[in-house]
């Protein structure tokens, strides 16, 4: 039998509302704010590289923000930020000697990938570190020093942690409610 068009519309609206209430959507909004706000403010105040470094730090810290206790989230986000900061610092100075860069990339790649044996959150921290390793060669800091760029990457991770903490205090039971509703 054919259903009425209003039945289809109400079903789609229910599905849309369920998507908008999901934790995946709220994390996407959180990452969108954490990544876009530093870029916008950096462009606005003519400090593009600082905004970009903060954006990178927030982006590379966000994968370890998965369901679990807030203590584990905090440790994962801070570990991702520290790893991205160290890798960004090392990667910033590896552009000078090719033979040195290849050996350091191999060593860092293995060491960072080895972190993933410690569990799912550790594999996401490892993913952040490997992503930071690859992308550290894509950008050359021109206006600020490499160590400053690395520090702003770490500050971007702290920025994401601050936003995640605020979001957690606004919706402390969001993940549990979604788990029980399924």
Predicted features along the sequence, with ranges:
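A transmembrane helix-and-boundary motif of multi-pass membrane transporters/channels
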Residues: 1-182
